[in-house]
Amino acid sequence: METTASPVPSDLPRLSVVVAMVDPWPAAKACMESLVHQSPEESIEIIVADGNGNGLPAGGLPPRVRWHQKPGRSVFQLRALGFAAARGDIVASTEDHCKVAPDWCRSLLELHDLYPDAGGIGGAVENGADRSTLDWVHFLIANGPYMRPNRHHTTGTITGQANVSFKRKFLPPESREDGVLQMEMNRRLRDRGVELRMDDRLVVWHIQSLGLLGTCRMHFHTGRCIAGFRLPHLSTAGRLLRIASCAILPAFLAGRTAATVFKKKRCRFRLVRGLPFLALLVSCHTFGELIGYWFGAGDSPWKTR
């Protein structure tokens, strides 16, 4: 079911912002407030793909919002639904637990005008859950590579679903039945020769604090989802190689996180203080990938956030 708020300023918006929601309101309140308060003169639509059915309040919708209620869909399926529903020439994505900068939408449009050949532009992700060492380590593993500073340049790797945008003409015409894993989609665009860029003028804050058990579960389910999305493209030999690589995956993930932190000259003390959490979380992720390569994604796509 789709519900539409007041119409966007023009029949076809320039920018579509996709937000996949899996938790009930008010989990996405900060995200939605940061989006609906963007410059009113910009031609924007906000597409909420709601897998809970109660992701937005029951009253009137905020301006420029299209609300697709699809209870029971995974966050990956919801993201695919949002991309398919987008009408703007530029299609952006953020997460329901993120807060975007006040000039985010305007900057997106300006940067896509500035770089007409860029098919995708990723921005900076900063930590908005900064009260505990655990939350910092959780953030650094997944989003440390995208926190500021980032070089403003063409690159083979751009931000995931927290802060990324594409010219719609470069998006794949169809998505897999199990939805969109953003890192996989970015990689496939790169392999097609699509120009990808990073730019720190686009900033979002990632706000996620799940407690110790919840964070461990999140890293396990994320790992299992990654493996599950890879499986259809793996030969038997490739699958066995991925299973074997899990023996060194914890060291690789921990080393990559540490290298990022020390290269960017940020959060070094926080990471050193959180080394036990780092070891625990990369182990949870690795166990998730191992289970995923053996048995598939299972119900993990419905348990990620």
What residue ranges belong to the model's regions?
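Short aromatic/hydrophobic "clamp" motif used to bind/position activated sugar donors
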Residues: 91
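Short, flexible, basic/aromatic active-site loop/helix in glycosyltransferases
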Residues: 123, 138-157
